[in-house]
Swiss-Prot record:
UniProt-recorded name of the protein: sn-glycerol-3-phosphate transport system permease protein UgpA
SUPFAM superfamilies linked to this entry: MetI-like
Top-level taxon of origin: Bacteria
Subunit comment: The complex is composed of two ATP-binding proteins (UgpC), two transmembrane proteins (UgpA and UgpE) and a solute-binding protein (UgpB).
Gene: ugpA
The organism of origin for this protein: Shigella flexneri
Listed GO CC annotations: plasma membrane
Amino acid sequence: MSSSRPVFRSRWLPYLLVAPQLIITVIFFIWPAGEALWYSLQSVDPFGFSSQFVGLDNFVTLFHDSYYLDSFWTTIKFSTFVTVSGLLVSLFFAALVEYIVRGSRFYQTLMLLPYAVAPAVAAVLWIFLFNPGRGLITHFLAEFGYDWNHAQNSGQAMFLVVFASVWKQISYNFLFFYAALQSIPRSLIEAAAIDGAGPIRRFFKIALPLIAPVSFFLLVVNLVYAFFDTFPVIDAATSGGPVQATTTLIYKIYREGFTGLDLASSAAQSMVLMFLVIVLTVVQFRYVESKVRYQ
């Protein structure tokens, strides 16, 4: 089947049509990235009135800073927990829809509710439930002799921000997994059932391979979400504490730039984070995507 390219009467019309998107991209993406790169090579006074070119000194200082290296590894752990937990839990709930006969519509609606909640509100909600003195969940844990105080325990603080972040993202993942599972031809599932395959075997041998492209897409989306969009959760829940136990790269950039007024260090950190995300995305699309294609 042959396809024909669109023909425009004016040679400038195609450029005019893409101009709005190009302008938005330049103003809100390329320009800020260029300024961040420029400031990362400067030594800037706290008020931004004067600067001096220092080359790569900011990056050298950065990787000799133990607090920055700690936030680097904290980001890796946090992103891994949020991405893996979010995908597994969402896939589990999406697979349960097939086995819920009564109230399936109510179940689906209930699963979509977290997506309507702002990230900061989601964090505050779980702070109330995990409040060391009056929280409902902490009271329940105390009945079993478990003392909860995320303001003093770094492990509990990490669990809280991961839990709140996963809960906020679960609706998005659930929606895509549910749509992918529903798109699988029922004839394949029925044929496997006739051959004697149980529900678990049918899921791992048929459903899971067929939804691999959607899983890969959600892997990339959740990784970006964990790197950037969880900032409101961390800020509202722990403010990066205790003792910087939940300070991720994006939160340290905010703290250095807006609280510490160190624009050069903040810009250098943002460049490192951008480079890290680009590398991870390229690796995923280059090596992981090739393993999820199917005929």
